[in-house]
Amino acid sequence: MTITLGQLAQHLGAELHGDADVIIQRIANLETAQAGEIGFLSDSKYQQYLATTQASAVLLRAADLAMCQTNALVVKDPYIAFARVAQLLDSTPAPAVNIHPSAVIADDVQLGQGVAVGANAVIETGVVLGDGAIIGAGCFVGKNSKLGARSKLWANVTIYHNVRIGDDCLVQSGTVIGADGFGYANERGEWIKIPQLGGVVIGNRVEIGSNTCIDRGAIDDTRIADNVIIDNLCQIAHNVEIGYGTAIAGAATFAGSTKIGKYCIIGGASVFNGHIEICDQVTVTGMAMVMRSITEPGLYSSGIPAQTNKEWRKTAARTLHIDDMYKRLSNIEKLLDKQEQK
C-alpha cells in the first residue's frame, strides 16, 4: 500500500511540516530508513538520527521538530502514531483466502459472509463462524464452538468443543484453547480424573500469541475479557478469569480459579498461585511469584535481579546464614538491653 504524507497527516490528525505529496510505502527505524519510508522518534536517545536519517518523513513531538532535516508529522505521542501507521501499511497476508477444497467442514456449520478456511482445516458439527472469520491451514475447531466476526486463527490452532471466541480476535499458531484443565482427586495415592465440563469464553478484540494454552473450566467457564493481550507460551488453567484490558507477557502461568482484575500488566515468566484474586491496575514484574491475593493497585516484584556470577554466588551463600545471623542479632540486642537497664 502507498499513501501520501498529506493523507497520513489527515488520518492521524497530525501537523504536517513539508511536502504533502511525498509518497510513503513503509515504516522503518530512523537509523535504517530510506526514501519512501517514514520513521518515528519516541525516545530522546535516538535524537541524533534526526539529522542523518534518509526517511522521507518522521513522526515526532513538537519539541523535536527543529532538529528534523526532512518532512515531519508532529503528533502528541509518536509511538501511538507509529502503531496507527503500521496498521495502515500492514502487508501481513491473511491466514487463508476462500475455502480450500481439502478443508473438512461439517454439513451444519454456520458460515458467515466472507469466511475463509485454509487447507486441511477441520470444522466440526455445530460450529458457528462469524462474518469475515478466517481459519488458517491445519486448524481444528471442535463441536459447538463459535468464532466471532473478523476473528483469525493462524495455522495449526486447536479450538476444542464448546469454546466461544468473540469478534476481532487473533490467535497465533500452535495455541490450544479448551483442553482439559488439570483436575484430579486423590484417593489413597490413586489419581481420579475429574472431567472438565465447563468451556472457555473469550471476549472481543483479544489477541493470543503462539503456543499458549487456555484450559476449559471444571464446571464453570474459563473467561478472558475484552481487549486482553496474551503473549506466547502462557498457561491459563481452568476457571481462571482475566479482566478487561490486561496485558500478559510470555511464559506467565496462572493456576486454577485465579482472578486477575482490569488493566493489569503481568511480566514475563510470572507465576500465580491458584484461588487468589488480583485487583485492578496491578503491575507484576517479570519472574515474580504471586502466592497471595493483591488488594491494592501498584507495582509488585519478587525474585533476585541478575548479578555477575561471583556476586550472585556470594549473595546465595549468605542467604543460607540469614537464620543464624538473625539469632545472633537478637542475642546482641538482648545483651544491649540488659546493659542499658543497669
Swiss-Prot record:
SUPFAM superfamilies: Trimeric LpxA-like enzymes. CDD domains: LbH_LpxD (cd03352). Keywords: Acyltransferase, Lipid A biosynthesis, Lipid biosynthesis, Lipid metabolism, Repeat, Transferase. Pfam families: Hexapep, LpxD. Disulfide bonds: none annotated. Gene3D superfamilies: 1.20.5.170, Hexapeptide repeat proteins, MurE/MurF, N-terminal domain. InterPro entries: Hexapep (IPR001451), LpxD (IPR007691), Trimer_LpxA-like_sf (IPR011004), UDP_GlcNAc_AcTrfase_non-rep (IPR020573). Its EC number is 2.3.1.191. It catalyses: a UDP-3-O-[(3R)-3-hydroxyacyl]-alpha-D-glucosamine + a (3R)-hydroxyacyl-[ACP] = a UDP-2-N,3-O-bis[(3R)-3-hydroxyacyl]-alpha-D-glucosamine + holo-[ACP] + H(+). GO terms for cellular component: membrane. Pathway: Bacterial outer membrane biogenesis; LPS lipid A biosynthesis. It is an enzyme of class 2 (transferase). GO terms for molecular function: N-acyltransferase activity. GO terms for biological process: lipid A biosynthetic process. The active site is at 238 (proton acceptor). Homotrimer. Belongs to the transferase hexapeptide repeat family. LpxD subfamily. Catalyzes the N-acylation of UDP-3-O-acylglucosamine using 3-hydroxyacyl-ACP as the acyl donor. Is involved in the biosynthesis of lipid A, a phosphorylated glycolipid that anchors the lipopolysaccharide to the outer membrane of the cell. This is UDP-3-O-acylglucosamine N-acyltransferase. The gene is lpxD.
